[in-house]
Amino acid sequence: MQAYNTQTGIVCPLDRANVDTDQIIAKQFLKSIKRTGFGVNLFDDWRYLDEGYPGQDNSTRVINPDFILNKPRYQGASILLARRNFGCGSSREHAPWALSEYGFRTVIAPSFADIFYNNCFKNGMLPIVLDEEIVDSLMKATFANEGYELTADLERQVVITPTGEEYAFEVDDFRKHCLLNGLDDIGLTLQQSDAIKEYEQKMMQKTPWIFNEVRA
């Protein structure tokens, strides 16, 4: 997993509350067993005027010119500014996969659905909770200034505006450690590989019949 320390990027304002995971990545795209290929269908029902399906050539589809991600000024955005309860609805890790593959590494909102919030950390993304008044202010600044950028500093736990204002955010120490060091669940397990091998050796001596059955 790619480590996260500090990110500066163009902000895309998604001025909608209660954006659920089916809106982030629609159910028809969940059939793939891979973790890749979802970015092109991020917010599919909003980005396109025609219905999408897996394996479709999106270059032939009808773009919705009114949707925020399709506006030229937000091309290349890597920080998503959202409203309360972002990522609600059904549990699907495909949602952060789609956001990440599209190019978003940071999502800022007044609140997140718990499962989505946890899944972000497992996939190298930083979900930042800021007060609704602060999000309102950032929304206004983003709409008013083309190319508006923010900096998210995980080490210091602050969001920094172009004029130097800093907004502190909370993050669990363990999650912070994992992001700073690029550790997902597999990476954390591999860090304990010596201890795991030592445990297995002890168990092979204590209960050898279990391992015999496994080998068989």
Curated annotation (Swiss-Prot):
The pathway is: Amino-acid biosynthesis; L-leucine biosynthesis; L-leucine from 3-methyl-2-oxobutanoate: step 2/4
Which EC numbers does the record give? 4.2.1.33
UniProt keyword Cytoplasm present: no
* Xref: InterPro entries: 3-IsopropMal_deHydase_ssu, Aconitase/3IPM_dehydase_swvl, AconitaseA/IPMdHydase_ssu_swvl, IPMI_Swivel, LeuD
One GO term describing the cellular component: 3-isopropylmalate dehydratase complex
Q: Which domain of life is it from?
A: Bacteria
Q: Into which EC class is this enzyme placed?
A: lyase
Q: Which reaction does it catalyse?
A: (2R,3S)-3-isopropylmalate = (2S)-2-isopropylmalate
Q: Which UniProt keywords apply?
A: Amino-acid biosynthesis, Branched-chain amino acid biosynthesis, Leucine biosynthesis, Lyase
Do the record's keywords include Lyase? yes
Gene3D superfamilies per UniProt: Aconitase, domain 4
Purpose? Catalyzes the isomerization between 2-isopropylmalate and 3-isopropylmalate, via the formation of 2-isopropylmaleate.
Q: NCBIfam families in the record, alphabetically?
A: leuD (TIGR00171), PRK01641.1 (NF002458)
Q: Which family does it belong to?
A: Belongs to the LeuD family. LeuD type 1 subfamily.
- Stored HAMAP family: LeuD_type1 (MF_01031)
This chain's protein is named 3-isopropylmalate dehydratase small subunit
List the taxonomic lineage: Bacteria, Pseudomonadati, Pseudomonadota, Gammaproteobacteria, Moraxellales
Q: Name the encoding gene, please.
A: leuD
